[in-house]
Amino acid sequence: MRARTGPVLLVVGVLAVAAACDAKPASRSSPAPTTQAPAHAGGQHAEHGGVAAARTPRALAAQLEQYFAQHTLLAVRQMRSVLTATPDYRTAADGELQEYTGQLAGVVGGAYGDAQGERFERIWEQGIAHFTAYAEAVAGNDAEARQAARAGLLADADAYGAWFAEASKGRVAAGDAAAVLRTHVQQLMDQADAYAARDYDQAYKVERAAYEHMFEAGTSLAKASFPPRTAAALDAPVEKLRAGFAMLLGEHMQLIIDTQRATFAGAPEFKAAAAQVNANTAALTQGMGAIVGPAKAKEFQSAWAEHVEGLLEYSTAVADNDEAEKAAAREEMRGYSSRLALFLSDIVRNELPLGPITAALGQHDQHLVDQVDAYAAKRFGDAQEMELEGYEQMLGVANTLVGAIQRTVKPQLPVGGSQTGGGGTARRR
């Protein structure tokens, strides 16, 4: 498995370089940025529709990053539903995973052709079957079945490598592509093993690594579908800035969901999930520090930590069935969102209007409130929908923020890089 700090350090460096290379004077005539999910990704899951074909390297990368990363988390949660023997949640997870696989295959087919998309889908579906078999074997303590599922997953990785080499017309070697997927399958097996052993700290650490690994794999899959000179656009600093923020903000959304749901599972799992929320907050704070300097980064960390606390206070109130505390938490969340929106608007010199960013953060909070309410009521299908819609919406926020940073912000790095504190303050009262 990759070193835990690898992606975070990469993102911090990218944020600093990208802001330096792409900062431009603010223009009074610049249109107000959107805070909705990007058109290439947004609004599809609620209606269970198709995905619009990407026409540019940036659009395709954004799609594949989203779909690979989200698919990873759907698979993780589906495997855990097997381990915990929660059939109602498993039914919802199975359905969402199947549907998302079809949509992912549609994105791949749009990039590489329908025939290659269909071949990819067969490989991916086989992988899902083997992940499920692995989880069932772990749950049943069946060593022979576990080994058979592992062998199947490694064969799936080889099949993916052969497919990718052919689909990319040799731009990617089969062995290199297979190695990427071998890392993926090993991570998902490792998290299942850790979760079954109640080593929740390890399970959630590996889950986060798996999300980041497949987000990056999505970028690579997108690049390989274009000639090298066209694909080079994805190496531009502003594109790396976009990808860095999208990865971290999407990860924030997903880790909050994990932690809110872990509220119902008991303190050990809650603390393990919350630790990864804090690690994500630390990474976001470092990224902000690379762009705006350590003083502003500390302001961000404080505002973001309040945002996190409000969301987790709400889920605690839901778990306790405390209507008064739920109402109080919602009121506090509105104040936290306003403070965070003011900070973000200020650092980009009002290039990002206060109203839209406040509304976007409020929508983010609402997605998380709705999903935990649905989860608590065992409306697992609704909870899944809120999860997917909320993830897409956060990618839209990332694009909006990157656009504003690109137009206005220059990094203010101290000697030795950004010196910020560590993490948010996710905790259960």
Enumerate the language-model features and the residues they cover:
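Bacterial N-terminal signal peptides that target proteins for export
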Residues: 1-9
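Short, low-complexity, disordered segments immediately C-terminal to signal peptides
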Residues: 22-44, 415-420, 425-428
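Preference for long, well-ordered alpha-helical segments
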Residues: 180-225, 360-409
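Long, amphipathic, charge-rich alpha-helical segments that form helical bundles/coiled-coils
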Residues: 70, 116-142, 152-159, 170-196, ...
